[in-house]
């Protein structure tokens, strides 16, 4: 596989083979293959990234390399290279990503790893409501812009995180008790966020940690108290109107056991109901904050849990915030192989690069140690791919 990648990198554009499934096939500045293999179609994800997806063969005309006026373009769909992301794409997936934020951008050891190993980034905090709109109609984008600019300049896909969440929510939103006011506030916040980054975001976590309590019922929050279930449709429809090309997700934690109420009577049942009602939900994000093998939600439960989520009517699923207490090589392999085995699973994002920067520092849950050296789990994934 490495030899093939080198040969493709050295070949002239005219000699490039057709792009494989999930491979890049166009976008502003793209100079690689612009047709897809048989049985695939070239679909626009955003202005800079077109991707080969299952469907009728052939391709539509793509932007030439002169379009875009020098605008940075993500090349995360390129299957060349030897990092985790490139190897994962070679197995038919869209990305292997990580979480960063603006305060990581001057950390050279961390950023060098991101550039070499990961093809997608999620912003840890700077896109959350308290950071973006601390007071009504007063938006602050500077820190989120830094992450988006880094990603586009370095060819990384972006997951927008997050539009609605009951935590990190300004007090002025929590104090709203009027249905029409809260509806207008949600619509304005979502429209403003999604419009600003239109064409740059692959996936949005439209609703995050917000939907379900552990028994599968709606979580108590200002959104559910004032609007009931309706806040879901309000948020998703506003996001779809603002950027029809972005994939829209419900993202939640503790979706790691196939028979757990939060998975069955919570996520799967409600997503099916909402999709049937016309709410534009594209995907389910399972965060994957996992325990060690003896804990409540070990990695061993993930394969069956992913299959249960994939049995829903959502078009795709993703593992969005993966970290595992102890970072056992076997546990990471279990999760990666579970995603590889489920066609709807489009990608994995680990929740940070190094244990030094993890929100769970005592658990040492990531692929790199506190000195930014690869751990056994990283080596196991790289070797398995």
Curated annotation (Swiss-Prot):
Residues 1-19 form the signal peptide. One of its GO terms (cellular component) is extracellular region. Its EC number is 3.2.1.4. It is an enzyme of class 3 (hydrolase). Residues 105-384 form the GH10 domain. Gene3D superfamilies: Glycosidases (3.20.20.80). InterPro entries: CBD_sf (IPR035971), Cellulose-bd_dom_fun (IPR000254), GH10 (IPR044846), GH10_AS (IPR031158), GH10_dom (IPR001000), Glycoside_hydrolase_SF (IPR017853). Keywords: Carbohydrate metabolism, Cellulose degradation, Glycosidase, Hydrolase, Polysaccharide degradation, Signal. Residues 67-83 have a biased composition (Gly residues). The keyword Hydrolase applies. Residues 23-53 form the CBM1 domain. PANTHER family: ENDO-1,4-BETA-XYLANASE C, GLYCOSYL HYDROLASE. Belongs to the glycosyl hydrolase 10 (cellulase F) family. This is Putative endoglucanase type F. It comes from Fusarium oxysporum (Fusarium vascular wilt).
């Amino acid at each position: 596989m490495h030899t093939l990648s080198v040969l493709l990198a050295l070949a002239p554009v005219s000699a490039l083979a057709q792009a494989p499934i999930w491979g890049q096939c166009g976008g502003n500045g793209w100079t690689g293959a612009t047709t897809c293999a048989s049985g695939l179609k070239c679909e626009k994800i955003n202005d800079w990234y077109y991707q080969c997806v299952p469907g009728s063969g052939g391709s539509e005309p793509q932007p030439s390399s002169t379009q875009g006026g020098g605008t940075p373009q993500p090349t995360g769909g390129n299957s060349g290279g030897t990092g985790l992301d490139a190897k994962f794409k070679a197995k038919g997936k869209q990305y292997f990503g990580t979480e960063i934020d603006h305060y990581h951008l001057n950390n050279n050891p961390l950023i060098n790893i991101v550039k070499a190993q990961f093809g997608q980034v999620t912003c840890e905090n700077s896109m959350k409501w308290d950071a973006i709109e601390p007071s009504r109609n007063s938006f602050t984008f500077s820190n989120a812009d830094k992450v988006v600019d880094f990603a586009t300049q370095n060819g990384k896909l972006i997951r927008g995180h997050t539009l609605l969440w009951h935590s990190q929510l300004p007090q002025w939103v929590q104090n709203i008790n009027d249905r029409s006011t809260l509806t207008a506030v949600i619509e304005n916040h979502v429209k403003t966020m999604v419009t600003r980054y239109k064409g740059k975001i692959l996936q949005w976590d439209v609703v995050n940690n917000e939907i379900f309590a552990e028994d599968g019922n709606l979580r108590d929050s200002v959104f559910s108290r004032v609007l009931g279930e309706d806040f879901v449709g309000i948020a998703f429809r506003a996001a779809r109107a603002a950027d029809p090309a972005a994939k829209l997700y419900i993202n939640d934690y503790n979706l790691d056991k196939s028979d757990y109420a939060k998975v069955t009577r919570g996520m799967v049942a409600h997503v099916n109901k909402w999709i049937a009602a016309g709410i534009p939900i594209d995907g389910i994000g399972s965060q994957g904050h996992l325990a060690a093998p003896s804990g409540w939600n070990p990695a061993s439960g993930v394969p069956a849990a992913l299959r249960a989520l994939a049995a829903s009517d959502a078009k795709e699923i993703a593992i969005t915030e993966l970290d595992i207490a102890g970072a056992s090589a076997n546990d990471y392999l279990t999760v990666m192989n579970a995603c590889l085995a489920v066609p709807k699973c489009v990608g994995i994002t680990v929740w940070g690069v190094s244990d030094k920067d993890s929100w769970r520092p005592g658990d040492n849950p990531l692929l790199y140690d506190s000195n930014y050296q690869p751990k056994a789990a990283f080596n196991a994934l790289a070797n398995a791919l």
